[in-house]
Regions:
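Active-site neighborhood of HAD-like aspartate-dependent phosphohydrolases
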Residues: 1-43
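Conserved donor sugar-nucleotide recognition element shared by glycan-biosynthetic enzymes
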Residues: 22, 52, 88, 141-145
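Alpha-helix N-cap/helix-start and coil->helix boundary motif
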Residues: 23, 49, 53, 93, ...
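Alpha-helical substrate-recognition element adjacent to the catalytic core
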Residues: 24, 32-61, 65
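Hydrophobic packing residues within well-ordered alpha-helices of enzyme cores
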Residues: 26, 56, 92, 117-121, ...
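Metal-dependent phosphoesterase signature
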Residues: 57-94
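Short, acidic loop-to-helix structural element flanking the phosphoryl-transfer center
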Residues: 80-108, 114-118
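Substrate-recognition "cap/lid" segment bordering the active-site pocket of phosphatases
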Residues: 114-146
Length: 146
């Protein structure tokens, strides 16, 4: 086994298949807060991005009516209540295991709050593949690099 370097993985939507769930969370947030628009998956993918605050603007949230911090907290409450139904992406575990066997060091770089990231990785039994789990100190998703 020869170490070949470091691989940085994304977590949400890459190693963990939560795209359909986060898409449904957006539509739930819009409905809950009285907004008429809903997004199909393709439109969701078009507007999603970082910073999350700008994504919320693209989705149509009015921060004068619903402040971003409150929306972010509400989203995380809803997301955390249902995320256990999300599983690793197809072949993620096998790929991580094979790369580990070949000597690659692997880390996760995520815009998720770090404690949530650690819980989600552990709940899926993948923590042993990573040398580091790099997440944010808060839930506001400004950038993966802070």
């Amino acid at each position: 086994m020869q170490a070949n370097g470091m691989i940085f993985w994304d977590w949400n939507g890459t190693l963990m298949d939560d795209v359909d769930f986060t898409h449904s969370c957006l539509n739930w947030m819009l409905e809950t807060h009285g907004y008429p628009q809903r997004y199909d998956l393709a439109a969701y993918r078009e507007i999603f991005g970082f910073p999350i605050e700008e994504y919320y603007i693209r989705a149509g949230f009015n921060f004068a009516k619903h402040p971003y911090a409150e929306l972010a907290e509400r989203f995380m409450e809803h997301y955390n209540a249902g995320v256990d139904a999300c599983f690793p992406s197809a072949h993620a575990a096998e790929t991580l295991a094979e790369l580990s066997r070949r000597g690659w060091r692997q880390s996760v770089l995520s815009a998720s709050r770090r404690d949530y990231l650690i819980e989600q990785v552990a709940a899926r039994g993948l923590q042993g593949y990573f040398t580091e789990l790099l997440g944010l100190a808060d839930i506001y998703g400004v950038s993966k690099v802070q």
